[in-house]
Amino acid sequence: RRGVHWSIDPASGNATRSTPRDSERELQVCAQCHSRRAQLAEGYRAGAPLHDHYLPSTLEEGLYHADGQQLDEVFTWGSFRQSRMHEAGVTCGDCHEPHGQKLRAEGNAVCAQCHASAKYDAPSHHFHPMGSPGAQCVNCHMPATTYMVVDPRRDHGLRVPRPELSLALG
């Protein structure tokens, strides 16, 4: 994150990264724990190429719904890797503190780092009363699935909800 800044475009309400992401290194370091993967070799160290040691699961039948949302336990890497956010240069550290389970901001403020609150944190966007669970960005864009009865995890695909696709594809 050193030297990287996000500037919000007033017209779109979305942010642009100041410098292109030049590496997958951060995502690969996170993926050693936060991906569904098969181990190929022992001795992975942070900074080493992930694929020299692990084979992460990607879009495989049974792991994702037909629209790309996670179906089974994929540990966030797979869904994030296929997201528009990843494509735009977002990294894990833009939202998460790397050495703990804390987000860089609380609630919708984590999204407002890159998305204009006036446009997106408003009933005209989310169609819910302010402060309600439906008004929380993650409840539409990062739906949660609970694994092993006690472990809720959010889909990191960060998709735009498409109810018509859900109806058509099941």
Q: What residue ranges belong to the model's regions?
A:
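Primarily the internal scaffold of c-type cytochrome electron-transfer domains
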Residues: 1-170
